[in-house]
Regions:
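Flexible, small-/acidic-enriched active-site or ligand-binding loops
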Residues: 1-18
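Alpha-helical interface subdomain recognition
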Residues: 22-178
Length: 178
């Protein structure tokens, strides 16, 4: 089912010169919907925890649930920060390091975010009729696209170890955050 229809008839497109790695670019770009879906799943999970009652009180009042949601919020914030950083790097034109770091961080966050969201919801989170699964299934799909955690960790390692030992610190702290 389509949500919208776009037409680009008679639209002029300017071709820009680009010599980058398509896998790196794709890995960078996919972090935005990953981060957005994690935000949505977090909002749904917090809302559910604040509505669902068990043992006479809202499950969001239980310390264990609060702790898990705090970890989820941290992971979602990390994914958002990583995605923002890689898009700033894309604007600068030097994004290999940020792409590897961002996709790796978003993949790591995806594991925790989906685990926690489904634990908070219990079985209802997996049902086709409940909205949570539409976000978590997308997160898992995007996580597996354009390279695994091991792939991006290797990329990040290759980039950092290719720096001259004397210039490594400058390379790390001199990254412009846009």
């Amino acid at each position: 089912r389509s949500a919208a229809s776009l037409s680009f008839d008679n639209t002029e497109v300017e071709l820009l010169p680009w010599t980058g790695n398509l896998m790196t670019l794709a890995g960078a770009v996919i972090t935005a919907p990953m981060a957005g879906a994690m935000d949505a799943a977090l909002e749904i999970s917090v809302g559910y925890a604040n509505d669902r009652e068990q043992f006479g009180k809202k499950i969001g009042k239980f310390q264990a649930v609060q702790q898990e949601l705090a970890v989820f919020a941290l992971e979602a914030a990390a994914a958002n920060s990583a995605s923002i950083a890689v898009f700033a790097a894309l604007e600068r034109g030097e994004y290999d390091f940020e792409a590897a770091a961002s996709k790796l961080r978003c993949n790591m966050a995806a594991s925790e975010a989906t685990r926690i969201s489904h634990q908070v919801h219990g079985a209802i989170g997996f049902t086709q009729d409940y909205i949570l699964q539409s976000f978590t299934r997308q997160i898992w799909g995007w996580r597996s696209r354009f390279g695994s955690e091991a792939f991006w960790a290797d990329q990040l390692g290759d980039i950092t170890t290719s720096q001259n030992g004397n210039d490594f610190w400058s390379f790390m702290v001199g990254r412009d955050q846009g």
